[in-house]
Amino acid sequence: MAFLWLVSCFALVGATFGCGVPAIQPVLTGLSRIVNGEDAIPGSWPWQVSLQDRTGFHFCGGSLISENWVVTAAHCGVKTTDVVVAGEFDQGSDEENVQVLKIAQVFKNPKFNSFTVRNDITLLKLATPAQFSETVSAVCLPTVDDDFPAGTLCATTGWGKTKYNALKTPDKLQQAALPIVSEAKCKESWGSKITDVMICAGASGVSSCMGDSGGPLVCQKDGVWTLAGIVSWGSGFCSTSTPAVYARVTALMPWVQEILEAN
């Protein structure tokens, strides 16, 4: 009976689709265009979305933060003619029950600077809400005060290139576990390009790469997956010994809250 209760208890947790708790648990090696990553378990990163143009070309990733909102990188240059695809795992398959969602409004952070890549965040308001399910749900947003110290093991996901010179991106969603890198250590690679609105991770034999942009860097906090970073920029060769750079979500939360409350 105890086992039955446990199962129904887990079913209940899944049914509410709270943020940061996948109904299908991810399995990460080392926790477990991601270089040296691995295929994810289908549906285990339910907030991951693919941003596609009208031809169906995947150009960036993003994360669902609610039924109505997606967060991505400003440098992705999303337009209202693009679509958000939720619930996808294998982009080469027609068998998946995906949701193709139109974008009503694009809110690019007005302080985004394409030269310094500071404030690399855009919010997308969906024209119709995503239907939350076992394979589609939201990631938790951090508070301004949340801290993700150096060494924290986090995860990044995406359909980006698995080698910098690969001709195409992988069909199946890739994942990698990687540590947060201190600002001082990151500056050893990138110098003054690193600012307080960025957070670094990797240099551990894995890397984000072209096509992963806009996607999530998530860390577990109090048992839920929380969005610590948005894939922003890094080595042109997707070097696995150089940290990749992510927009620091905690530093951008005041702007996020302002947009969500006003809309």
Curated annotation (Swiss-Prot):
Reaction catalysed by this chain?
A: Preferential cleavage: Tyr-|-Xaa, Trp-|-Xaa, Phe-|-Xaa, Leu-|-Xaa
Q: List the disulfide bonds.
A: 19-140, 60-76, 154-219, 186-200, 209-238
Gene3D superfamilies, per this entry?
Answer: Trypsin-like serine proteases
Q: Which UniProt keywords apply?
A: Digestion, Disulfide bond, Hydrolase, Phosphoprotein, Protease, Secreted, Serine protease, Signal, Zymogen
* Top EC class, one word: hydrolase
Give residue numbers for the modification (Phosphoserine).
Answer: 93
Name used for this protein in its record:
Chymotrypsinogen B
Q: Which organism is it from?
A: Mus musculus (Mouse)
Classification from the root reads: Eukaryota, Metazoa, Chordata, Craniata, Vertebrata
Question: What gene is behind this protein?
Answer: Ctrb1
